[in-house]
Every structure is written in structure tokens, then in C-alpha cells.
């Protein structure tokens, strides 16, 4: 009967189970489709959010960079160093304006003195023509004794004039050397200036490369931070989902444990009941050995009755099927829990690996930032030193160029005032009539020749005045270019340097000649010595020396 009942009752649960499986599969497909759609929508929303966050980060960083630049510019403009520099420039400009007024007054006085000298030269030329006529008339009537005396006087005066002429030549030679030194120093400073310009360009190129590298590193850092944020969000979501699943599984596991404990209690009750039945059967077997078959059947009936009591509707097949289904569900849940545990372990490993990568990236980023900062500091220090050197050399170059320009202008004015002839210089190829570095020595040679001619004319005039009819004792020779004979010194053995009428090549002597700068005081001394007497020489020298001393003290204090 049991076999027949099982055969009859088996097809109905198979159909219901298949229908359930089909319904479950259909619902599972729907859920998978919904899950895929939700995953795709979440991915697209995450991608859009990441792009939006990255763009916002870039805009924030750009605004921060602009704010830093503006604050830096404001701090530089309002820094006490720049304010002190402006004050120093103002004081220097005021001092230069004051010196400009002094020099303009000196130039006006020199112009007046040169005009007076021109008038005197014209008068002297007229007197010389008159004296020549008188000399031709009175030459035959001169006494030989007086001639001897005059010859002796003129020889002494000529000796004194030659001494002064030699000193003039030595001073001119020294000035030529100073001019050559200035030209050589100018060439050397030009060479150094070009080298510093090249170094400055290379430093700027290296700075641009370093800035590009730093920007690339910063962009990589921003990308890594965005990835880290996305991974953290994903990790938080996975952890929350995992916690929910774990809670659900724990709830199911507790329910299954309760069910198993209930089944075990039921089975224990059944085993106790079976033990009692076995004992009774053993007693019955001992007593009644012949009735074993009937008793075994009775025991089966007792077990069957107990199972019917355990079953709800009295269906033993349903009870066994429920028990097997529960066991299968428990086994499936157990396998699902093990898979979840494995997934959790893999997720923990992945999160640990990601955290290690994040730590490594942070350490690499920090080391790269420190390296770029050190490189930028070194480059800034080198740039500061090079800019200081370039400023120093530029200031020196400006001073030397101002000195040379002032010297050229003064030589040109003196050349025009004493009516020198520049046909020898203009006859050369490439000359335009302007004073340059190459033809400056030629102009000096022509000026020196003209001064020698003027000195000879003055000596001849003195000779004619000394030969007057009523003059017994001649007046002492007074040189208009030296202020009087009171400053004359006894003759000393000096080496006479003849004037140079050509331009010397100095391109091969840049390293041999020591570099000395012709100061403003030396040029003013030379100007006043040639143009006026001893009183102007002394006062101008003292005044310019004091100004130069004050200027040097002020520059040292500012530097």
C-alpha cells in the first residue's frame, strides 16, 4: 500500500515544483534585468558625477592659483623692500638732479671762459701780426749784447715751457691709457653681459620645464584623488550591502538553527519512544518467541502512528518531502554562505590592496612634491643670484657708457671751440664726423697738436713783447692754460711721450691691460685744467672729489 500510495502521489508535487521553478526563473530574469539596468544607471550617474567633480576641482584649483598670484603680487608691491627701493631711487634721482644743476652751472661757466679765451686768441693774433711788422723793421737795429740777453731769457723760458709741455704729454699719455682701459673694460663687460643673458635664458627654460612637470604631477594627483574618492564610495556601498546580506543570512541561519533544534527534539522524542518499544518487543520476544512476526508488524504500526502524529495532515509523503526540501534549502544556504564568505575574503584582500596602493601613491606624491619644491628653491636661488649679478654688471655698464658719452661730448665741444681741423679723420673710410670709440684717440691727437701750436704762438707773442724798446726786465711768462708762473715747479727728468695720430688696435690687449675706470672727477679735472687757471682747477677738483665721496658712501649704504 505504501508503494502504491507513493506512485499515485508523486506526479502532483513534481508539477507544482516545476511551476515554482519556472516562476522563480522568470522572476529571477526580471530581477536580473532590473539589476543590470540599475547597475548601468548607477555607472552612468557615477561617471557623470566624477566628471562634474573633476571639472569643479580643476576650476577650484585654477581659482586658488589666481588668488595666490594676486596675493603674491600685492605682497610684492606692498613689501617694505620695494618701498625702500622706491625711496632710495627718489633720493638718488634728487641727488642726480642736484648734480645736474651743478654740472650745468659749471658748463655755462666753462662756455663763458672759452668765449673769453677766443676773444683773447683773436686779439693775440692781431698783436702777433703787428709785432711781426715791428720785428722786421727793428731787427737790423738790435744790439748784439741785448740779443744775447734775450736769447738767454728765451732759452730759460723755453726750458720751462718744454717742462710743462712734457708734463702735458705725460698726462695725455695717461689719459690715453685710461681711455684704452675703459674701452677694454667695456668690451669685457659686454662679453660678461652676453654670457649672463644666455645663462638667464637657460634658467628661464629650466624653470618652465619644472613648472610643466609640477602641473603634470598636480593633474595626476587630482586624478588619483578622484579615483580614491570613487573607490571609497564604492567600498562604503559594498560594505553596507554586505552588512545587509550578512544580517539576512544570520536571520535565516538562526531560523534554520531553531528548526533543526526543533527537529532534533522531535527525533529525540521519537528515539526514546522507539527504545521503549524495542524493550517491550524484546520482552515480548523472550516471552513469546513464536509471535515475532506479529510483534514486528505491531512495532511498525506503532512507528507509523508516531509519524502520523508528527505529520500535520497525516500525510507521511508530504512530511518526507518537506524534510528533504528543507535539507536541500539548508545545504543551498550553507553553500551560499560559504560563497559569501569567500567573496568577503576576496573583497577584504582587494580593499587591503587598494589601501596599500593609495598609501604608495601618497608617499610617491609627497616625495615628488618635495623634489619639485627643492628644485624650485634651487632654481629661485640661482635666478636671484644671476639677477643680482646682471644688475651689478648693468649698473657698471651704464656708468661706463655715461662716462664715455660725457667724454665724447666734451671732446667734441672742445674740438669745435678751438677750431681744430678734422679733414684727416673725415678722409678715412666709414667716418661720419661723429666721435666714436674707434676715432676718439685721433681726436685727442688733433687737440694735442692744436694746443702745442697755441703754446708756440703764446711763446712767440711773449718774445715780441720782451723785445720792446723801453723794456729792460721782461715780464715772466704766463701760460693761460696753467694759470700763471707761480705754480711752475723746477724741471724734473721726465719721459716725453709723442702724440699718436692714428687709432691703435686694442682687440688683442683685453687681457693684458688692467681694467681701470676713468671717473667723473678725473675728466672734470682734465677739462678745467685745459680750459681755465689754477684757481678753477683746485676748486673744481675739491668740489667733485667731495661729491664723488658722498656718492660712493651713499651707494655702499644702499647696497
Curated annotation (Swiss-Prot):
Q: Coiled-coil stretches, from where to where?
A: 14-70, 185-261, 364-414
Pfam families attached to this UniProt entry: ODAD1_CC
Q: Which terms does the UniProt entry file under GO BP?
A: cilium movement; outer dynein arm assembly; spermatid development
Keyword annotations of the record? Coiled coil, Differentiation, Spermatogenesis
InterPro entries linked? ODA-DC/CCD, ODAD1_CC
Gene name on record?
A: Ccdc63
Q: Which organism is it from?
A: Rattus norvegicus (Rat)
Q: What is this protein called?
A: Coiled-coil domain-containing protein 63
**What is one GO cellular-component annotation here?**
axoneme
> What is the annotated role of this protein in its UniProt record?
Plays a role in spermiogenesis. Involved in the elongation of flagella and the formation of sperm heads.
Coiled coil as UniProt keyword:
yes
